Amino acid sequence: MAGPGSTGGQIGAAALAGGARSKVAPSVDFDHSCSDSVEYLTLNFGPFETVHRWRRLPPCDEFVGARRSKHTVVAYKDAIYVFGGDNGKTMLNDLLRFDVKDCSWCRAFTTGTPPAPRYHHSAVVYGSSMFVFGGYTGDIYSNSNLKNKNDLFEYKFATGQWTEWKIEGRLPVARSAHGATVYSDKLWIFAGYDGNARLNDMWTIGLQDRELTCWEEVAQSGEIPPSCCNFPVAVCRDKMFVFSGQSGAKITNNLFQFEFKDKTWTRIPTEHLLRGSPPPPQRRYGHTMVAFDRHLYVFGGAADNTLPNELHCYDVDFQTWEVVQPSSDSEVGGAEVPERACASEEVPTLTYEERVGFKKSRDVFGLDFGTTSAKQPTQPASELPSGRLFHAAAVISDAMYIFGGTVDNNIRSGEMYRFQFSCYPKCTLHEDYGRLWESRQFCDVEFVLGEKEECVQGHVAIVTARSRWLRRKITQARERLAQKLEQEAAPVPREAPGVAAGGARPPLLHVAIREAEARPFEVLMQFLYTDKIKYPRKGHVEDVLLIMDVYKLALSFQLCRLEQLCRQYIEASVDLQNVLVVCESAARLQLSQLKEHCLNFVVKESHFNQVIMMKEFERLSSPLIVEIVRRKQQPPPRTPLDQPVDIGTSLIQDMKAYLEGAGAEFCDITLLLDGHPRPAHKAILAARSSYFEAMFRSFMPEDGQVNISIGEMVPSRQAFESMLRYIYYGEVNMPPEDSLYLFAAPYYYGFYNNRLQAYCKQNLEMNVTVQNVLQILEAADKTQALDMKRHCLHIIVHQFTKVSKLPTLRSLSQQLLLDIIDSLASHISDKQCAELGADI
């Protein structure tokens, strides 16, 4: 950790050099042994593939392999292998190979006896082999010999040898349309269809030694998914995920995760209303799901008699869904090579409008880094895959490949599509503020709660940014304290609010809140810092009652976002065992909406008889019993139409407003940039930066002022504001010239990952234009970023006619003008030599 006054953390910029064909920023770890100077920054100037771009690759010709669905695909090295499926008339057992480098199809070499023709089987890769399990076999044309299988075959990629594994002992029931994955040297099989019913059992088998292995049934626990088939599974963060699928009347759009370690299932709750994010995908079957980085990507399937073609993305860390917006060049077709843009080929350098159209996605912001235009295809066609089901997907490197499937009118497809992922280090904003809350460092306010006068400490900056009600309370307490100090003739120093004489920590501000108890108030405070609460045990009466108390506080404090979260949790937790307790508590707390939910739950036909026979029912208050009986006798009230839900503001939105002026009166530290003061908030700086945390803990300046630099370099005021935006609310969008100043900031200031640096690097690689090249040249010269300076001079030389008309050119330093002249002279000399050589 970099201490105050030191040269700061150090960076390994060369290690950050990403692939030359993708805008995917690498998630690299800190290397504190390297130089923190951008002098050693290595950049890749293209060509790039646009993130979130769909490309249509060459389809599989009929003479190589039939169009198909219900097949499997796996990825091995630089190839996609397709096995089995059906072409609408017959089942298949051929093995096709697609080379992603040269975009060529062929039949894979095979020896031995392959599996019988089949579909709805599973295929996984382990080591240098592919394993095929189960599926449906027989003659679909004559409708004979149709049966499910439970056989296991191995295909060795190196030799092309097919081998059937003969397993002794218990076997899984024969099945098709199941899920399969590999984890910890084992094949895991879940659910499927056995010909009579859907399943939800799980089996596993070791793949290291077929002579010693056997099938084992897994004893699952927790919230096991319902019996289902035609669903995908994916492994991410050492967990297996299952989304939707065919479950008869029980079909849902729930996402389940399986912990391999303790064999436990959990249904993941959705909080899209709370987070202001899109809802989960519709319930569906026949779709695909793959994992990349910390995300799950769901595509296609049949969703309530439709075939949607949106790509849905689930963030495993933040538990949110979103619809991925394809890049604009996906929609207008590929430039130059719509069917041959594979890994081995050079992607043409496009202008900004042609390449990204400034259609900004969540993970990328892009401007032009190219200087030449590519010819437009004569007949542009959409590169987006149409909706389909029973297709298959696999991941190679940083891209997803989708092949085949059933499209409109039950037509089989032979198309191959490629989707470019994006990958950036995750935003740690919520975690950083949560860490501040847990540590209780630098607390400057103490809330005195309830009749017991229990105390909970916090930070004025966070609380006043998130809650107007608590902000008023804190303001009133400060005014009372100021009046008291004035009466005692001891005014608070004005030049450094929040800093006591000699740099000592000022006394805590005491705020009394009589209507709140400590435990629910702590849950509320956790929400203010993180935008979420740690999920209690679902259905446990004590936890449900606690969240009801939190809900009551959220209503009193006008925290709409917390209201929605509490309601979602409580309504999802109500069951036959706790409904009466929850209903009685809701009536006592005057929580009318929750009370209505409980009453409607009780009077359901399938619940009522069980509820009234419980002992808890006998102990209910008479008015509540009467209300339940009357509710049962009368038709339930008509449900009003859905009203817009006020989800309030998020942590990011509140901290943005706080930095932009809403928190001005609560500033308690002054940052000096080249002598210019910028008021700020200690708690926020300490939460996001180990540099400031160490300073405020052990080296607090006596005058409450901190000089700002990054190593020996003083950033521009614009770059400094960009850094503050990142610190306060995680903003990474900034002008490219700011990125040169801030590239080393994550190491010097001890940010908790390299997200800012990854975006700075991408920004520099992609966002230099003729319009901003001179500003970036100045920044590169000041920061001694030699690689970027050379690139800027290269652009200036090749676009000098346009650059010469920019007013900024006349304000450059003499030395930079001489550098431009030298580069022009060198370019002209090289050009003349080339022309002379051509003449000779």
Curated annotation (Swiss-Prot):
Superkingdom of origin organism: Eukaryota
PROSITE patterns reported in the protein's UniProt record: BTB (PS50097)
GO biological process: one example: negative regulation of Ras protein signal transduction
Effect of L812P: In SWN2; decreased interaction with CUL3; impaired subcellular location; decreased ubiquitination of Ras
Post-translational modification comment from the UniProt entry: Phosphorylated on tyrosine upon induction of apoptosis, leading to its degradation by the proteasome.
Effect the entry attributes to changing L187R: In SWN2; decreased binding to Ras
UniProt domain BTB: residue ranges: 443-537, 667-736
Modified sites of kind N-acetylalanine: A2
Transmembrane segments: none
Effect recorded for R619H: Has not effect on protein abundance; does not affect localization to Golgi apparatus; does not affect function in regulation of RAS-MAPK signaling
One Pfam family hit: Kelch_1
CDD domains: BACK1_LZTR1 (cd18505), BACK2_LZTR1 (cd18506), BTB1_POZ_LZTR1 (cd18308), BTB2_POZ_LZTR1 (cd18309)
SUPFAM superfamilies linked to this entry: Kelch motif, POZ domain
Kelch-type repeats, residues: 79-128, 130-185, 187-238, 239-285, 295-341, 399-450
Oligomer and partners: Homodimer. Component of the BCR(LZTR1) E3 ubiquitin ligase complex, at least composed of CUL3, LZTR1 and RBX1. Interacts with Ras (K-Ras/KRAS, N-Ras/NRAS and H-Ras/HRAS). Interacts with RAF1. Interacts with SHOC2. Interacts with PPP1CB.
Name recorded for this polypeptide: Leucine-zipper-like transcriptional regulator 1
Species whose genome carries this gene: Homo sapiens (Human)
